[in-house]
């Protein structure tokens, strides 16, 4: 795999079959992007989809958002690392112990897999948080969980671009920010409530940009990826 890749773009293989995902991968250059495998794709096709993408020289972000008791979370993260995953995530709300143990399990087994946490899903807003019993607002919850993630020595968090500036100031420049909800100006917002353009997200402090439909549903995905990279 191309460990020297310098692109911030992670293409999300969401709502796609294995055949469609591999057909898309065959149109893209692994030197220009990484690929994200989420719950649906992984549940349907398992490790084989990851292996097939690795065979095409892509680095893979396994977006399974593990959320369980500490040992189960740590073992799941370790299993992902053993697949050769570039990056994997957990829910910060699983707690400090789960995150810390997962990171330590990677270190104990000499894996350099990036481990990041999800604070608040980008589909959620203040009203959605109130429905779950969190009443002090989106910003407070994101900041609280990001700080907990840093304390657990994880590599970064998933966050919206609107949260990036504050989180860089709060957690430091080395704390990686992975931003979904990236759209071009003429794209539909779909189910993301906190969205941003690629260039603005980087300006705001995001390190990696998760881009799905803008590329996967394009007539020419490779050309669309090039257009996005040129816009940066």
Curated annotation (Swiss-Prot):
UniProt pathway annotation: Pyrimidine metabolism; UMP biosynthesis via de novo pathway; UMP from orotate: step 2/2
Active site: 65 (proton donor)
GO process terms (BP): 'de novo' pyrimidine nucleobase biosynthetic process; 'de novo' UMP biosynthetic process
InterPro entries xref list: Aldolase_TIM, OMPdecase, OMPdecase_AS, OMPdecase_bac, OMPdeCOase_dom, RibuloseP-bd_barrel
Keyword Lyase part of the UniProt annotation: yes
Pfam families in UniProt: OMPdecase (PF00215)
Catalytic class of the enzyme: lyase
Keyword tags: Decarboxylase, Lyase, Pyrimidine biosynthesis
Catalysed reaction, written as an equation: orotidine 5'-phosphate + H(+) = UMP + CO2
Alphabetized GO MF terms: orotidine-5'-phosphate decarboxylase activity
Identification of the protein by name: Orotidine 5'-phosphate decarboxylase
